[in-house]
């Protein structure tokens, strides 16, 4: 059976965009049986109890950049062989990844399978995984119109991937006390932090007794 394969690993920053794309496809009538998810032990936590067909594998991650991947080249080659053999029987129509350390593996496997390969890049500066994989991609969908360090002829700007289920605010209206949270991602954190500090300077927003604010950031980014 032909399937669309979605490859996403690690934390919610990479897994949730893939899940939101999948959910939009399901809402448009795509059968869940035509979707296969490839992830790791961290990523699978976001798909538990959602009844998707999945492949879970300990893909190599690195905190030392490209050096860490070179030191684990044997494990990476093993993961490529494993994924190629696993996906071959499904005869996938395409491979789609949201980046991180699985992206280069997905790129090579897509070439071995001779199927189209697509990338979604959330940040304005592409991470190492997507940067290395972009030359293999048919299209790189971006959240920003001016995404850096990826070939311009590969980019198709589509805007950020959103969770459309959040448009129902009935529960918020029923809550007498409201807490607003601010949290930035790996590359969006500075912009969001700056916005929070600017927001805090406006005393109008702190005269409301029923509203409180929580700002999640690193200690080194905290302004006292």
Task: Show which residues each predicted segment covers.
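An aromatic- and histidine-rich active-site surface loop
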Residues: 42-46, 92-113
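An amphipathic, basic-hydrophobic alpha-helix
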Residues: 65-94, 112
């Amino acid at each position: 059976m032909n399937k669309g394969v979605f490859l996403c690993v690690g934390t919610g920053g990479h897994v949730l965009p893939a899940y939101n794309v999948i959910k939009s496809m399901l809402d448009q009538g795509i059968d869940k049986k035509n979707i296969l998810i490839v992830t790791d032990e961290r990523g699978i936590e976001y798909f538990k109890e959602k009844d998707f067909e999945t492949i879970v594998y300990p893909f190599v991650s690195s905190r030392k950049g490209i050096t860490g991947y070179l030191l684990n080249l044997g494990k990476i080659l093993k993961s490529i062989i494993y994924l190629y053999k696993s996906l071959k029987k499904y005869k996938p129509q395409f491979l789609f990844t949201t980046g991180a350390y699985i992206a280069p593996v997905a790129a090579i496997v897509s070439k071995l399978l001779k199927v189209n390969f697509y990338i979604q890049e959330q940040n304005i500066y592409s991470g190492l995984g997507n940067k290395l994989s972009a030359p293999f991609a048919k299209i790189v969908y971006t959240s920003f119109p001016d995404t850096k360090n990826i070939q311009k002829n590969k980019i198709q700007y589509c805007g950020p991937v959103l969770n459309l289920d959040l448009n129902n605010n009935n529960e918020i209206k029923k809550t007498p006390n409201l807490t607003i949270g601010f949290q930035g991602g790996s590359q969006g954190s500075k912009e969001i932090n700056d916005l929070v500090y600017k927001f805090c300077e406006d005393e109008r927003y702190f005269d409301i007794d029923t509203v409180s604010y929580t700002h999640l950031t690193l200690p080194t980014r905290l302004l006292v």
